[in-house]
Amino acid sequence: MARSIKKGPFVDGHLLKKVEAVRGSNDKRPIKTWSRRSTVLPDFIGLTIAVHNGRQHVPVFVTENMVGHKLGEFSLTRTFKGHVADKKAKK
């Protein structure tokens, strides 16, 4: 189910404070966060946010197309190694 419009998008408070601090100081370092559940807001455009994927922080540069999506969508948690080909099919 989608989130109610009257509630508005969810963003963790600590992440919002970090974004406001970076906007004021003009700092170019990525913002580290573990909050994969936070929604990307228009205030985040142009910032690099390092989103944790369970093992490391993946840098994500926020663009206009990402607004409204969750940060976790851009930091993959599973590595796909590929399917193994059938040995019988090769012959």
From Swiss-Prot:
Domain of life: Bacteria
InterPro entries: Ribosomal_uS19, Ribosomal_uS19_bac-type, Ribosomal_uS19_CS, Ribosomal_uS19_SF
Keywords: Ribonucleoprotein, Ribosomal protein, RNA-binding, rRNA-binding
Gene3D superfamilies per record: 30s Ribosomal Protein S19, Chain A (3.30.860.10)
This protein's GO CC annotations: cytoplasm; small ribosomal subunit
Entry keyword annotation includes rRNA-binding: yes
GO molecular function term, any single one: structural constituent of ribosome
A Pfam entry, by short name: Ribosomal_S19
BP GO terms, sorted: ribosomal small subunit assembly; translation
Function recorded in the entry: Protein S19 forms a complex with S13 that binds strongly to the 16S ribosomal RNA.
Family under the similarity heading: Belongs to the universal ribosomal protein uS19 family.
PANTHER family: RIBOSOMAL PROTEIN S19P FAMILY MEMBER, SMALL RIBOSOMAL SUBUNIT PROTEIN US19M
Protein's UniProt name: Small ribosomal subunit protein uS19
Organism: Thiobacillus denitrificans (strain ATCC 25259 / T1)
Organism lineage string: Bacteria, Pseudomonadati, Pseudomonadota, Betaproteobacteria, Nitrosomonadales
